[in-house]
């Protein structure tokens, strides 16, 4: 009995990009790490009142106090 074309095509390896099964946990762990890093950074930058990213509120700066203490 000769194999048909359908059976021969099923036995061929699929071409294209395939990810090994062993890398699935790595991709999952990296996705969780990236998502948690993004979430914690967002939380720190947008909800922390003591964090000073720019000079919009100079009253929160302690630089003048430190410079005045050094000058005295």
Curated annotation (Swiss-Prot):
| A UniProt-annotated Pfam family | B12D
GO cellular component assignments: membrane
Main location as per UniProt: membrane
InterPro entries in the cross-refs: B12D (IPR010530)
Q: Where in the cell is it found?
A: Membrane
Its transmembrane ranges are 20-42
Query: What keywords does the record list, in alphabetical order?
Result: Membrane, Transmembrane, Transmembrane helix
Topology relative to the membrane, per the entry?
Single-pass membrane protein
Give the family this protein belongs to, as stated in its UniProt record: Belongs to the UPF0495 family.
> What is the protein named?
UPF0495 protein KLLA0D04334g
